[in-house]
């Protein structure tokens, strides 16, 4: 049974309250580095990405440098990451598109971001919200799992349905805090196996809601 909007909001706000200082866990210094890091994080832990990116960004600090590199040169720096050959191909193509279509700058709109090779809706939403402060809600595996486990959405909900549901429940200024808190919550408490959510009864203290 999917929770009412008021009860779902209560659960999400309690998760935010558990991790009020949650921050992005990917290391980056500018919009290009953020875009690259998020692209690399697909099916890979943020910790693994953070080990690979310092040398990658030193070798290819700009879209121009990345576009000029061969795929094999890029692969050398990310070979310990999942799907690294595909990611190297996407990074080179994406860098070329940034130069050709956006004067070497990372665009700010979802439509423009999703026009880039290797950039889907989740990556676009992270870049918009974290990089540019534009309200957007990114759905990763933690977010989707938590929303289903806590009946915020039905078990069959797609990532887009999860995104729209959370955006309907929370005001825009809470979308990014919710996304980041849910990642922490998913890692520390709401595990894929043996979740420990029952130790946090405040999540379910609905009172008269």
What residues fall within each predicted segment?
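Catalytic cores of DNA base-excision repair glycosylases
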Residues: 2-209
């Amino acid at each position: 049974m999917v929770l009412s909007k008021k009860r779902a909001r209560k659960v999400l706000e309690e998760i935010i309250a558990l991790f009020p200082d949650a921050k992005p866990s990917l290391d980056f210094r500018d919009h290009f580095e953020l875009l690259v890091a998020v692209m690399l994080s697909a099916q890979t832990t943020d910790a693994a990405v953070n080990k690979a990116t310092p040398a990658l960004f030193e070798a290819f600090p700009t879209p121009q440098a990345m576009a000029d590199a061969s795929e094999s040169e890029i692969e050398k720096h990310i070979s310990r990451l999942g799907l690294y050959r595909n990611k190297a191909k996407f990074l080179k193509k994406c860098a070329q598109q940034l130069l050709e279509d956006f004067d070497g700058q990372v665009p700010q709109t979802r439509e423009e971001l999703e026009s880039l090779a290797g950039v889907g809706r989740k990556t676009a939403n992270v870049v918009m919200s974290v990089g540019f402060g534009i309200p957007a809600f990114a759905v990763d595996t933690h977010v989707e799992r938590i929303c289903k486990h806590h009946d915020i959405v039905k078990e069959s909900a797609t990532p887009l349905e999860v995104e729209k549901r959370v955006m309907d429940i929370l005001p825009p200024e809470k979308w990014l805090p919710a996304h980041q808190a849910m990642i922490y919550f998913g890692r520390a408490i709401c595990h894929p196996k043996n979740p420990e959510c029952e130790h946090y009864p405040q999540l379910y203290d609905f009172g008269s809601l």
